[in-house]
């Protein structure tokens, strides 16, 4: 099974820009590349912060761009989102009995669990898992088929990464999440967004991938405190392949427009410049 991961689209109303960028331009470029190069993917998942201010015109704009995707989409909530505004333009997206945007989808190759970490009451954008969401997670992990990998997706990381300000707005109750995992089942892979940086590693024995943002980025700065250092580093998406014996993640810089050449080309090898 193959799929694509995007995150932190931070959409705004048509005609608006944030930090000098138009998120719609970037997502349109990603959609075109995905349609052209990945016709065999099962879905595209967007792991939250769909809209920057959670306003209805932004979700309207997002829906228009995503309509161009040929693959199905799985959409998630991030700290910038508003569930009710989102639901007006994406009425077909499943919500659980408590109204949270989270699902379990069982594919032949893997089980996909999406977890809603949005806390709309938080003044500082940190995530939270209430009792209802922890119960959802416990049931999802306990009931997932044992004969295939389980991939867990959530917006907020449940751990620090060294990005000092971002560490103050991660998941607020990571121990509660871990307690559920410890008594049920460890996901085979954990996918997240929120940090606007490409980060990978292992959390308590679980390999993880944090996807770079589609819009503005968080600069690689492990010293800055009291604010979030931003940058215009180029965006990318992750192309994930799930096989019986491996999970492979490739990053695609879909807006790169520089030269392409063969490393076996002796002329290219000795060129001074392109």
UniProtKB/Swiss-Prot annotation:
Enzyme Commission code: 3.1.4.-
Q: Which Pfam families match?
A: Metallophos
Q: Which residues bind Fe cation 1?
A: 8, 10, 49, 196
For binding Fe cation 2, which residues are annotated in this chain's numbering?
A: 49, 79, 155, 194
Which residues are AMP-binding?
10, 49, 79-80, 196
Keyword NAD among record annotations = no
How is the co-factor bound, per the entry?
Answer: Binds 2 Fe(2+) ions per subunit.
Provide any one GO MF term from the record.
nucleotide binding
Keyword flag Cell wall biogenesis/degradation: no
Q: Which cofactor does it need?
A: Fe(2+)
What enzyme category does the UniProt record give?
hydrolase
| Key words of the record | Hydrolase, Iron, Metal-binding, Nucleotide-binding
Q: Which SUPFAM superfamilies match?
A: Metallo-dependent phosphatases
**Hey, which family's this protein in?**
Belongs to the cyclic nucleotide phosphodiesterase class-III family.
Record's protein name: Probable cyclic nucleotide phosphodiesterase RPA0124
Source species of the chain? Rhodopseudomonas palustris (strain ATCC BAA-98 / CGA009)
């Amino acid at each position: 099974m193959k799929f694509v991961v995007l995150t932190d689209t931070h959409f705004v109303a048509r005609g608006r820009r944030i930090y000098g960028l138009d998120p719609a331009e970037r997502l349109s470029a990603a959609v075109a590349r995905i349609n052209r190069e990945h016709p065999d993917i099962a879905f595209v998942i967007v792991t939250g912060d769909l809209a920057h201010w959670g306003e209805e015109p932004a979700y309207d704009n997002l829906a228009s761009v995503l309509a161009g995707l040929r693959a199905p989409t799985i959409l998630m909530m991030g700290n910038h989102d508003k569930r009710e505004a989102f639901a007006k333009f994406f009425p077909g997206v499943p919500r659980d009995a408590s109204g949270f945007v989270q699902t379990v989808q069982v594919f032949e190759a893997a089980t996909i669990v999406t977890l809603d970490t949005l806390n709309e009451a938080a003044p500082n954008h940190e995530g939270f898992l209430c009792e209802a969401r922890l119960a959802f997670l416990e049931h999802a992990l306990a009931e997932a088929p044992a004969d295939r990998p389980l991939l867990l997706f959530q917006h907020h990381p449940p751990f620090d990464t060294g990005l000092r300000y971002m560490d103050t707005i991660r998941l607020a109750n990571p121990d509660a999440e871990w307690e559920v995992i410890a008594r049920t089942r460890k996901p085979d892979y954990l996918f997240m967004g929120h940090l606007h940086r490409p980060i990978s590693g292992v959390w308590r024995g679980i390999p993880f991938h944090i996807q770079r943002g589609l819009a503005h980025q968080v600069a690689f700065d492990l010293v800055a405190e009291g604010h979030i250092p931003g940058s215009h580093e180029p965006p990318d998406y992750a192309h994930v392949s799930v096989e019986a014996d491996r999970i492979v993640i490739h990053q695609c810089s879909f807006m790169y427009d520089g030269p392409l050449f063969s490393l076996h080309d002796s002329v290219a090898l000795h060129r001074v410049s392109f």
